[in-house]
Amino acid sequence: MSVSAFNRRWAAVILEALTRHGVRHICIAPGSRSTPLTLAAAENSTFIHHTHFDERGLGHLALGLAKVSKQPVAVIVTSGTAVANLYPALIEAGLTGEKLILLTADRPPELIDCGANQAIRQPGMFASHPTHSISLPRPTQDIPARWLVSTIDHALGTLHVGGVHINCPFAEPLYGEMDDTGLSWQQRLGDWWQDDKPWLREAPRLESEKQRDWFFWRQKRGVVVAGRMSAEEGKKVALWAQTLGWPLIGDVLSQTGQPLPCADLWLGNAKATSELQQAQIVVQLGSSLTGKRLLQWQASCEPEEYWIVDDIEGRLDPAHHRGRRLIANIADWLELHPAEKRQPWCVEIPRLAEQAMQAVIARRDAFGEAQLAHRICDYLPEQGQLFVGNSLVVRLIDALSQLPAGYPVYSNRGASGIDGLLSTAAGVQRASGKPTLAIVGDLSALYDLNALALLRQVSAPLVLIVVNNNGGQIFSLLPTPQSERERFYLMPQNVHFEHAAAMFELKYHRPQNWQELETAFADAWRTPTTTVIEMVVNDTDGAQTLQQLLAQVSHL
């Protein structure tokens, strides 16, 4: 009996089972213990294979692929700390709804806790963050193949969002020629190998039912808050709110067109919050709100009813409103709850939104971070997509820009970390094949710098804007101690990215004005390669401009 041959047959059943649940993209890191999984994936023609040498980046690459494809994405890594590097992406997926399947190779039980190399306690290491965790036994013909495939089917068939951790111990030898070992074991699955359906099919979960009193509430004064959603959902939500005559407060990730732009500016005006107090119902569609003033208003508002609609399960309201938590696909929910044509009830807010936008436009000429955030719509590629980083840049775009309705926008706004942003953007581009504009800060770019290796492989033009404000300038907006702000919060690194781009053979520009930036974009969109555009700005101008605009709009 060949141990290596049976390891591969065992792994082949696992990998084939994944294909029955829509897995097409599979991300693989180098490693020896994961050889059975890697070879099984390589031999399965259903998969699109992605590789990366850094497991943390690999996890975020899978996250980006899952964001766009809306399908589960598998990741294969070897044993040891390689597994731990998947933690950040797993956490983000659980909060933002992507499906990740983590196949982690492991040493067999007799090599754990005895000083063996690269052997750690992997079962349960992700605590409660996976939706399902499976600790498989060492491959053995004593366990029927139907147990293995039905175990995988159960986990994936009941997976709605988040990750599945499948820990896979393999004994040595890991290498060797294939023989007939385990062939009859594998063949007991019969015509399943020629089929394309799961061995075990789980019934789909029930969606939220229609709210029977919706016809009552839609006649009231309402407010629509739009969080993260798909481009198609964003367009539908905008039309729905317009028909109802309800003001729509759209987040940067809502893709609604933000019909009342600069919400995070005008929500700081007492006239706006006073008018919003008249709302009898607030319907929040989608989660992960960005703006500070929006979050403050959301926490303080007290309508008669506060409804949250999202297909992610669990509590999504940090303000703990009285109301309803409705688990449903947003587009499906809108269809069940049609709008009735009514006149807008808000008068003051549209005026304030227009005045806030004019205040932003009046400052657009200076070459700076805040101005770039406002102008970002001018640089979006046709039939493309936008990936927005975290920290200051996403807040500036949210407050100062007005993204077009239905234009795809992606971000990691679950745990809102700055780790893995470039890797996620790479996955977003690969899954869609669209021209992509990604924008991050300098510390975010440094944090995931080796992901520039992933950006060498793109199928359409990708522009990475690195806004270099020399540190974490988001802390300039917070009451951090002035005496220790630079040393312990901002942490300026005094670096530039020209040599990093050169190391990975990426095109690079460092424009000094708007004309040079536009020229760089025109050049970048011509070829299916990655271009790094480093925009060096004054350290504090972005944060200061936002604070000045907040003060100005609050007194309108």
UniProtKB/Swiss-Prot annotation:
Reaction(s) catalysed by this chain, per the record, are: isochorismate + 2-oxoglutarate + H(+) = 5-enolpyruvoyl-6-hydroxy-2-succinyl-cyclohex-3-ene-1-carboxylate + CO2
GO BP terms: namely: menaquinone biosynthetic process
Q: How is the cofactor bound?
A: Binds 1 thiamine pyrophosphate per subunit.
Name used for this protein in its record: 2-succinyl-5-enolpyruvyl-6-hydroxy-3-cyclohexene-1-carboxylate synthase
Q: Which family does it belong to?
A: Belongs to the TPP enzyme family. MenD subfamily.
| Alphabetical list of HAMAP family matching this protein | MenD (MF_01659)
One example of the protein's molecular function in GO is: 2-succinyl-5-enolpyruvyl-6-hydroxy-3-cyclohexene-1-carboxylic-acid synthase activity
Subunit comment: Homodimer.
- Return any one Pfam family short name: TPP_enzyme_N
Cofactor(s) needed: Mg(2+); Mn(2+); thiamine diphosphate
Q: What is the lineage of its organism?
A: Bacteria, Pseudomonadati, Pseudomonadota, Gammaproteobacteria, Enterobacterales
